Amino acid sequence: MNFLLTWIHWGLAALLYFHNAKVLQAAPAQGDGERQQGEVIPFLKVYERSICRPVETMVDIFQEYPDEVEYIFKPSCVALMRCGGCCNDEALECVPTEMYNVTMEVMKLKPFQSQHIHPVSFQQHSKCECRPKKDIRNKDNHCEPCSERRKHLYKQDPLTCKCSCKAPDLRCKSKQLELNERTCRCERPRR
């Protein structure tokens, strides 16, 4: 009986979702300016806003560049599209399936020395899906860490286990250096 009710519940939710998907694609998340305070927001709108999708998120620059401790960034955080929302199953999490880099100008201050506006690259998420949580995955599927030393320099694709450098090549080139893919460090070009 519970199984049947669960299927009916999800079927109804899916029907409502797909029926109104066109309308909500263009609607912003805070687009309820015309609603009166205290008015009840309908279930469908609440449900559609909670699904796993890219949403604008404020990200601390030091979270993305933990090695840049000698600088103060202005602004200290930037608005990026990142995966967020619910998966309606405790064993799943909302993760990015497509990403791209965006470059933003931020001010880098070195206290009592200098301040310059620099291009800084960040990763944005363009598509998201609900996937099994890392700690629940089968051990056969588990990815080995990128590097025991300097783990913070790498990012890892949870699907392919491929490791790549967090530091964008553009950051190194702006300093007339080259990115060493093996060490994920900016180095002087070899002649």
From Swiss-Prot:
Residues 1-26 form the signal peptide. Glycans are attached at N101. InterPro entries: Cystine-knot_cytokine (IPR029034), PD_growth_factor_CS (IPR023581), PDGF/VEGF_dom (IPR000072), PDGF/VEGF_growth_factor (IPR050507), VEGF_C (IPR027928), VEGF_C_sf (IPR036841). GO terms for cellular component: extracellular space; membrane. The keyword Manganese does not apply. GO terms for biological process: cell differentiation; induction of positive chemotaxis; positive regulation of angiogenesis; positive regulation of cell division; positive regulation of endothelial cell proliferation; positive regulation of focal adhesion assembly; positive regulation of mast cell chemotaxis; positive regulation of peptidyl-tyrosine phosphorylation. Pfam families: PDGF, VEGF_C. GO terms for molecular function: chemoattractant activity; growth factor activity; heparin binding; vascular endothelial growth factor receptor binding. Keywords: Angiogenesis, Developmental protein, Differentiation, Disulfide bond, Glycoprotein, Growth factor, Heparin-binding, Mitogen, Secreted, Signal. Homodimer; disulfide-linked. Also found as heterodimer with PGF. Belongs to the PDGF/VEGF growth factor family. This is Vascular endothelial growth factor A. It comes from Bitis gabonica (Gaboon adder).
